[in-house]
Amino acid sequence: MNTNGSGYGHGTGQGNGRGLGSGGPSGAELPELPGLSGLRSANAARVLELLRVAGEGGISRLELAEGTGLTPQAVSKITARLRGSGLVAEAGYRASTGGKPRTVLRLVPPAAHAVGLHLDRDELTVVLLDLAGVLVGRRVVPLDLGAGAEAVVEAVAVEVESLLTASDPGGALSAGPLSGPLSTGRSSAGQVSARHPGCVPAQLPATPAPGPAGSVAGPGPAPWPAQPAPQPAESGPDTHTSHRVLGVGVAMPGPLDHTSGIPHRVTGFPQWDGFPLRDALAERLGLPVALDKDTNAAALGLALQTNAAALGLALQGSGDSFAYLHLGTGLGAGLVLGGGLYRGARTGAGEFGHQVVQLDGPSCGCGRRGCIEALCLEAVADGDLAGAARILGVGAANLVELLDIDRVLLGGRVVEGAAGTFVRGVGEQAPVPVELANGGPHTVAQGAAQLVLAPVFGRAEAAFSPPLPPSRTGQKIR
């Protein structure tokens, strides 16, 4: 297993603390997610990544071989498995300089999905993304993080199921292996019908029906760059497959240990300390689950955006460094250094809100006095948003001086309510560009879904819940 923090699978994320990147040794393992058991290799991830980047325009096998450095024979074997799984389909033909036209392959975004959860102190956001990272559905409901861990797990599971039902009225979304050669050998049909009599798999509609009150389901923005349209090809069996939920990414306030999936003493909610949230939710849903801090998830999602300019990132290659500062019910930071998500030696990096900037300042929930979080939230409570922005700017300037980062991105519920005030106020203090991270109100939840999606394409490492026993895999979400 790769130990530098940029590997794939059940990695620890130790070493340099970075979990973002597309590199990795040949043969490195990908997460053991439902439907991907035959593709846990760095080579398959590289092929999938090129298909993802190519978008609807597609890419030929020869171009895949040139782009990955693999032999044409290896590419043919990998793409055959991908087609059999339903993740890839033929997209037509493209003229070549000589000989017959080349067959073009494309990713099938609706073939698989990931759920992203943002557990805030008073609110739960659930999103569903397809393979291309496009928002398919979302649900926002009140949440009491202090209601007790078991009660929160059950409430979260119910909302996940509600969103999947709203986004998938045909009943096609389920947990378990995709049809085709990638099947784990355990048929899910009997389990699905046993739990849902009369349930018939169907295609996920292009425009999902709206869900119940509190939810919105609908297509996201077009994710693909403009490409020359290939000539249409005959549709084959690989274009028709049931749609699967690969896993669930969970983001919540820290501190926490993302490798074990266990929160520590969340400020104001000490009862979460030591609770095995990741594994408890995996057991309840019957899906692989990954857990990380809310700010880490947001930073990961922002760094992975295909259309970086639309989010105000303008990332230049893989070496960009930025801090994402999130001010909502608390204050924290997600750090991307040299292109890698930085978690620190003990996974605790980014506890930005608890740096002391006023020794005789107000008490903080962490037990100290004068923390920048306490000062910011006090100013917000007093209605002094400009003052809160200045305080946040002091902390941001300190962070820039310490880490020599390229830019500062702002997000969170409070910032979004007065974006201009915060961008100006922080920008007056910080010596680098300060921008609003235009991921919108669901930046954290969408980043959480990327905890599941990014490893599939070899773009990040992940620490998932242990493999579920055979009796729990391949089950329909209840």
Regions found by a protein language model. Give the residues of each.
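Short beta-strand(s) of the beta-wing in winged-helix/HTH DNA-binding folds
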Residues: 89-90, 95, 257
